[in-house]
Amino acid sequence: MALHYYCRHCGVKVGSLESSMVSTDSLGFQHLTNEERNDMISYKENGDVHVLTICEDCQEALDRNPHYHEYHTFIQ
């Protein structure tokens, strides 16, 4: 099993972790609400976990353009 992190805005792969490197408890998933967990985490048939996050480029774009938070997506 591996954890794969992808940007929720542009889809770029941010990184991956092998499950043997870290326990899922240390990732803080238990602190998410059920709605957040459903929106951010998906479990694949092969046992991998895909997590939606935000990449540095998209975070910088949001920091420079706060009104982008109003949109479901700001990538065109």
From Swiss-Prot:
It is found in: Cytoplasm. Zn(2+) binds at C7, C10, C55, C58. Coiled coil: none annotated. Disruption phenotype: Cells missing this gene prolong the activity of sigma-F factor and do not fully induce the activity of sigma-G factor; sporulation efficiency is reduced 50-fold with most spores arresting in the engulfment stage (III). About 10-fold increased sensitivity to DNA damaging agents, 60% reduced chromosomal DNA transformation; plasmid transformation is unaffected. Partially suppresses DNA damaging agent sensitivity of recU deletions. Partially suppresses DNA damaging agent sensitivity of recU deletions. Pfam families: Fin (PF10955). An anti-sigma factor for sporulation specific sigma-F factor, by antagonizing sigma-F it allows the switch to sigma-G factor and progression to the late sporulation development stages. Might stabilize or process Holliday junction intermediates, although this may be due to polar effects on the downstream mfd gene. This is Anti-sigma-F factor Fin. It comes from Bacillus subtilis (strain 168).
